[in-house]
């Protein structure tokens, strides 16, 4: 039953990634957020042509870990759905449909010059506040032209960039007093605390 519950939670999270252009998730540690995101990013790249997917992780080691999970998932894919690969490196993966996945540590210059179709920020609350602010300021105009964004993190500070986006995502009353499905910043918020993990003891 715990495995079924875990799979159901992952499906719900995948649905949140897919159904909303912008989503932000506040999640406890060991909740499967990186693994779930890796699966979704791989699917998105293989089944949507000419996409540039950027992984911006808290640290370079985190970016590499997500890419490792993506490569592992790719190798496990059945032949009939596995897209051809034209470049297979530690920091990037390029497919024969023109899509690519790039993994980098988050700096103020990450993603600069790229036309990003899908941005995934991992453990965004733990990026140094000044860097996170500069990064978000520089990357936001790119997303405004039609890109998707997925942000996941465990919470850290009350006034960092992650907290600001989370706060905006939870303000769902517009200027006319109507309740919206997404926040005033366009983000859909999702939250799961540590004791909701099916393997945790109550």
Question: Where would I find each of the regions flagged by the language model?
Answer:
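Walker B catalytic acidic pair
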Residues: 122-126
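Single conserved hydrophobic/aromatic residue that forms the stacking wall/gate
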Residues: 1-8, 12-14
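Conserved Walker A/P-loop ATP-binding site and its immediately adjacent core
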Residues: 50-72
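Conserved P-loop NTPase catalytic core
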Residues: 99, 155-202
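Inter-Walker segment of RecA-like/P-loop motor cores
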Residues: 65-117
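Short, conserved "post-DEAD/DEAH" coupling segment immediately C-terminal to helicase motif II
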Residues: 129-146
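Walker A/P-loop
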Residues: 19-41
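Structural recognition of the conserved hydrophobic beta-strand(s) that form the central parallel beta-sheet
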Residues: 102-103, 147-154
């Amino acid at each position: 039953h715990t495995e079924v519950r875990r799979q159901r939670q992952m499906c719900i999270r995948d649905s949140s990634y897919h159904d909303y252009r912008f989503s932000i998730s506040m999640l406890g540690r060991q909740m499967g957020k990186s693994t779930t995101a890796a699966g979704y990013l791989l699917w998105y790249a293989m089944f949507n042509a000419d996409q540039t997917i950027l992984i911006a992780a808290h640290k370079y080691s985190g970016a590499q870990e997500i890419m490792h999970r993506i490569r592992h998932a790719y190798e496990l894919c059945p032949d009939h759905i596995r897209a051809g690969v034209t470049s297979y490196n530690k920091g990037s993966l390029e497919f024969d449909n023109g899509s690519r996945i790039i993994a980098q540590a988050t700096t103020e210059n990450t993603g600069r010059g790229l036309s990003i179709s899908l941005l995934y920020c991992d453990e965004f609350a733990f990026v140094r506040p000044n860097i996170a602010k500069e990064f978000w300021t520089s990357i936001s105009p790119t997303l405004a032209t039609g890109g998707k964004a997925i942000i996941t993190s465990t919470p850290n500070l009350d006034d960092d960039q992650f907290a600001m986006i989370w706060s905006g995502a939870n303000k769902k009353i517009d200027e006319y007093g109507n309740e919206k499905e997404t926040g005033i910043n366009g983000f859909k918020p999702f939250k799961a605390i540590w004791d909701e993990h099916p393997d945790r003891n109550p």
